[in-house]
From Swiss-Prot:
<dbReference type="GO" id="GO:0019029">
    <property type="term" value="C:helical viral capsid"/>
</dbReference>
<feature type="binding site">
    <location>
        <position position="125"/>
    </location>
    <ligand>
        <name>RNA</name>
    </ligand>
</feature>
<dbReference type="Pfam" id="PF00952">
    <property type="entry name" value="Bunya_nucleocap"/>
</dbReference>
<dbReference type="GO" id="GO:0019013">
    <property type="term" value="C:viral nucleocapsid"/>
</dbReference>
<comment type="similarity">
    <text>Belongs to the orthobunyavirus nucleocapsid protein family.</text>
</comment>
<dbReference type="InterPro" id="IPR043012">
    <property type="entry name" value="Bunya_nucleocap_N"/>
</dbReference>
<feature type="binding site">
    <location>
        <position position="76"/>
    </location>
    <ligand>
        <name>RNA</name>
    </ligand>
</feature>
<feature type="binding site">
    <location>
        <position position="183"/>
    </location>
    <ligand>
        <name>RNA</name>
    </ligand>
</feature>
<dbReference type="GO" id="GO:0003723">
    <property type="term" value="F:RNA binding"/>
</dbReference>
<feature type="binding site">
    <location>
        <position position="48"/>
    </location>
    <ligand>
        <name>RNA</name>
    </ligand>
</feature>
<protein>
    <recommendedName>
        <fullName>Nucleoprotein</fullName>
    </recommendedName>
</protein>
<dbReference type="GO" id="GO:1990904">
    <property type="term" value="C:ribonucleoprotein complex"/>
</dbReference>
<keyword id="KW-0687">Ribonucleoprotein</keyword>
<dbReference type="InterPro" id="IPR043011">
    <property type="entry name" value="Bunya_nucleocap_C"/>
</dbReference>
<keyword id="KW-0167">Capsid protein</keyword>
<feature type="binding site">
    <location>
        <position position="182"/>
    </location>
    <ligand>
        <name>RNA</name>
    </ligand>
</feature>
<feature type="binding site">
    <location>
        <position position="51"/>
    </location>
    <ligand>
        <name>RNA</name>
    </ligand>
</feature>
Length: 233
């Protein structure tokens, strides 16, 4: 008797239903009481290593522990799992990164004591390698965190303009900006903030432009790209 092979459809990720704010509330409800700056420090210092571990682990769900706190992540870094559906309230490494960055921002924005503790303990490698330190401000420094683009209002458009500079300075494919260009700014849709918040975007862009990484000149193509966002150099 011949072998029978039955193929069924695999549900695709429905990005339209994912609301980062709702996901963050669920994350805080589950992990908020345990979170501390040491855990955040361990996470960001080991995020690259964690991504590598996930890419080599053939398990759709993986438990990772940072600073004594266990997080169960949907593994969308293993090659065969990149298209697997992710429930709206589930954690991925990217979402965890954004949630932790927002948690730090929420803890520190009106509390100088906590801000001083965060500045002492937390290191954001992606910011440091670009010459950005805590002295540039909470929102710019944490805005370098992967996933921070989910919270453009919290991080004052810095994740967006950091990606702009990556396109201009590092040669990052502009298509990678599709994710940040879909995000909301508070209650504003992407279509709304792109017309109503141009001045805020320009201010954030110019602030990042003061970093040594971003100070070199702009090509004509780069100027044309920036003009699409109302930024004229």
């Amino acid at each position: 008797m011949a072998n029978q092979f039955i193929f069924q459809d695999v549900p695709q990720r429905n990005l339209a239903t994912f609301n980062p704010e709702v996901g963050y509330v669920a994350f805080i409800a589950k992990h908020g009481a345990q979170l501390n700056f040491d855990t955040v420090r361990f996470f960001f210092l080991n995020q690259k290593k964690a991504k590598m571990v996930l890419s080599k682990t053939a398990q759709p769900s993986v438990d990772l522990t940072f600073g004594g706190i266990k997080f169960t992540l949907v593994n969308n870094h293993f090659p065969q799992y990149t298209a697997n559906p992710v429930p709206d309230t589930a954690l991925t490494l990217h979402r965890l990164s954004g949630y932790l960055a927002k948690w730090v921002a929420d803890q520190c924005k009106t509390n100088q004591i906590k801000l001083a503790e965060a500045m002492e303990k937390i290191v954001m490698p992606l910011a440091e390698v670009k010459g950005c330190t805590w002295t540039e401000g909470l929102t710019m420094y944490l805005g370098f965190a992967p996933g921070a683009e989910m919270f453009l209002e919290t991080f004052e458009f810095y994740p967006l303009v950091i990606d702009m500079h990556r396109v201009l300075k590092d040669g990052m494919d502009v298509n990678f900006m599709r994710k940040v260009l879909r995000q909301r700014y508070g209650t504003l849709t992407a279509e709304q903030w792109m017309t109503q918040k141009i001045d805020a975007v320009r201010a954030a862009f110019n602030a990042v432009g003061q970093l040594s990484w971003a100070k070199s000149g702009f090509s004509p193509a780069a100027r044309a790209f920036l003009a699409q966002f109302g930024i004229n150099i």
